Structure formats: C-alpha cells, structure tokens
Amino acid sequence: MKEAREAMPNVGSSSSQYVLAAIKFIQFNYSHDISVDDIAQAVGVSRSHLYRVFMSNVGQSPIDYLTSYRISEACSLLKNSGLSIAEIAVSVGFFDQFYFSRVFKKVKGVPPSKYLVALEKEAQAAPQPINP
C-alpha cells in the first residue's frame, strides 16, 4: 500500500482516495473471483471512472493491477510456501491452473514451473552457512 501511495502524486485528491480504496480492496480480495465491476462497486464509483482515475494515478488499468498483484503473490508463494502450482493458482484467485500458467508466463516471461526451477537453482547456488 505504501508503494501505491508513493506512486500517486495527488494522494489528497478524491480520485487518489478512490484508487487507494481500490488497491486496498484488491489486496484483501485478490484470492477471490473479483472483477473490475466488483472493485468499482466496493469503492462507490462507476467502472469507467475507476478505470480513468486508476490509469491517471497508477499508470495501469485496475485489471492489470489485479493481475500483477496476483502474480506477485504467486511468486512469493512459489518461493516460500512449498505449495503445488495448482494450489498456488487457486490461492491467488485463478481457478484454472492452465490459465494461471498462461498469465504467469505473460507477466514473468516463463511459466511457473520454470520459475520454480530457477528459484531452486538459485537456492542451491547460494553460499551455505558454515556450521562450527
């Protein structure tokens, strides 16, 4: 949320308050099947108004932000949770593992399975602490 505030120059304006409320809604509900209409309704503005103020303040559409946030959370889970890719997909709001993999690849450049392999290789290459 702090990053969102820093990215928006007019945090005091009402449009920025709508965006902050939308971001908060996304962060609390990203794991559910939510749409831009749901976000707009939660914030109390029309879908088109939300789109305009989001683009103006964040530089991306609400759906792109939601997708980016979901993929970011998926990356954290891939790195830290030990959950399967299917479990991670569901936990970040994708109810079709194959669609999740396509979206993940579009955003990150590699499918989640290859991302996980890269994380494992990175962990193996990291220096191990010396036990006394």
Language model regions located:
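A short alpha-helical element within helix-turn-helix/winged-helix DNA-binding domains
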Residues: I39-Q41
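Proline-centered helix-kink/hinge sites
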Residues: P62, P111-P112
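Metal-dependent phosphohydrolase cores
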Residues: F100, K108
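Terminal helix-turn-helix DNA-binding modules in bacterial transcription factors
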Residues: L20-K24, F28, D33, D37, ...
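Key DNA-contact positions within bacterial/archaeal DNA-binding proteins
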Residues: S48, F98
